[in-house]
From Swiss-Prot:
This is 3-ketodihydrosphingosine reductase TSC10. One of its GO terms (molecular function) is NADPH binding. It comes from the Eukaryota. It comes from Eremothecium gossypii (strain ATCC 10895 / CBS 109.51 / FGSC 9923 / NRRL Y-1056). The active site is at residues 147, 161, 165. The lineage of its organism: Eukaryota, Fungi, Dikarya, Ascomycota, Saccharomycotina. Catalyzes the reduction of 3'-oxosphinganine (3-ketodihydrosphingosine/KDS) to sphinganine (dihydrosphingosine/DHS), the second step of de novo sphingolipid biosynthesis.
Amino acid sequence: MKYELNGQVVLISGGSQGLGRAFAQKYIEESDSTVVIVSRSEEKLTRAGEAICGGARRLGAGGAGRLLYYACNLGDAAAVGGLFATLADAGLQVTQVLFCAGGAVPGLFAELSSAQLAAGVEMNYGTALHLAHGAVRHGARHLVFFSSAAAVYPFIGYSQYAPLKAALRALVAVLRQECDGVRVSCVYPGNFASEGYAEENRTKPAITAAIEGSSEAISCAACCDKIVRGLRSGYDDVTTDFVGWLLLACNMGFNYHSTTYFLWPLGWLLGALVNLLVVPIYMLLCRWDIHKWRTQREETHLAAKTD
């Protein structure tokens, strides 16, 4: 199924900011599609509408305009049911769904609160789960999930985030087998500069930042453009940088593979070689870095107690 910007009714979760808002803006500026942005906060949605095109109208309120918004807790299945009922009342048949909602609160597992961990499950998996369930039942033809490079390389500091992004990858694999006639794509973006990314860096442990490295965060608009190019090229596992592509090549697994992708043979070969030759050495280095960090941390705590 070809990816098209034009002629769609597009539902974007997390559409009030970050990458979701960038996609909404792209559809409004470069197509004739109707766009529905969804998030919890009506205030953020109205601000996003003003920034994108001078103002959006609330779904179900009547009036003209291609950009609509709907405030909804997507982690609540009943609320998602209400969203699709409102879409039906407005005469809108959603054709594409972009699952942009999500976010990370980096921190050590034992130091995160139960509320933070539960919020991670809802925000990064529950919202996509319920929205996808409704979308499949209501005839959407293209689902675009947003996972993360952390789904294929989870590491220290991302216990609230990475396991749920990995769960999304598993859900995508199942839906590709179950949903005949529905295109199911999954994006594994690297770092991009957004409100959520700035918030992440406030709580990110030093060891997490060290292992993650100093990769530059690209703009949301640039990230959006890369994803659109990948989808238009027919790729259903889309990355936005070389590191993400390499990580995915190392984690092909029992999953649908886009064998028409011209770099697929290289990815298969390179992934096998990296797994055999590079990963064992790299993981030893990571263990050493974590050991040093843990030792320094214990010494700091001991010195603080002594003082």
